[in-house]
Amino acid sequence: MKPGLSMLRTAAAATAALGLCALAAAAPGGVNAGACKGTVYLTFDTGSMSQAQLIADTLRRHRIHATFFLANEKTIHGDSTLDDGWAPYWKSLAADGHAFGTHTFDHVYYKGEAGAGKVRFRPQFGEEGGRNVVWSEPEFCAELKRSAERFKAMTGQPMDPLWRAPGGHLSATTEAWAKQCGFAHVAWAPAGFLGDELPSERYPNDALLQKALSSLRDGDITMAHLGIWSRRDPWAPADLEPLITGLERKGFCFATLRDHPQYQAWLGAHPAHTAAR
């Protein structure tokens, strides 16, 4: 195990109990809940994990909750996001009260319909990584549940019945299939695309921050990643803290998707996903 990764995981485990106590004592969103002028729902997809600990620490420091969508992606440390070595990180986030959904296990992109009851996909990772595959509903549902089962094995907690398609690419078919096996799709607001995957030469962090602060509204869902391979000037170290403080100054609170009006009825009617499902 590389020293940097070992230190990251040790920090995650060491701060979990302290973070849980702090979050439990805080009002939702880190400010007086009664004073909220609106709620923004921060969400993070996996990725290179280069900013994973910074993001966790920032959320903990501000005593706010977010929602994470998990796929088994390659990381900067040479392992994958759902390997055993990352269990302390995910356990610490779960202990803090964050919510979790599936991002498919092998980060599987929708590529188009392939005839009656069939859809073409391209996994980014795994045995079929980089190749097109054609799946029916049972195979697609199994792919969604793989992340849920792995999350339960690592944390002891069930995964929320939510999913996000890689790249946001889906069809009426895949959305219906996912609902049949217990997952509602979560997209993001136009203003909620925080731009961390865009080239920093054309989209500098300051411009992305100002755009988000001026555009986000009550109920908006944001989307960023726990690390992006291609961006030279990472987004999170420059923008996450000022985004949170800037929104707090405008009277916004933060919550997980468990509290989003669009998903509350679904979550109330559908059980969380465990390895036993």
Per-range role (PLM):
Residues T43, F69-A71, G101-H103, W163-P166, ...:
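A cross-family glycoside hydrolase active-site/sugar-binding cleft signature
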Residues T46-Q51, N72-G85, V108-E113, L162-A172, ...:
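Acidic-and-aromatic substrate-binding clefts and catalytic sites of carbohydrate-active enzymes
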Residues H169-S215, F252-Y263:
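His/Asp/Glu-enriched short active-site or ligand-binding loop at hydrolase and phosphoryl-transfer sites
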Residues G29-G34, A66, I76, R232-R277:
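C-terminal domain-boundary segment and adjacent tail
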Residues C21-A24:
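N-terminal signal peptide c-region/cleavage motif recognized by signal peptidases
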Residues Q53, D57, P88-K91, P138, ...:
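Solvent-exposed, polar/charged alpha-helical surfaces in well-ordered, non-transmembrane soluble domains
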Residues M1-T15:
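Bacterial N-terminal signal peptides that target proteins for export
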Residues A27-W135, E143-P161:
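Active-site beta->alpha N-cap acidic-glycine motif
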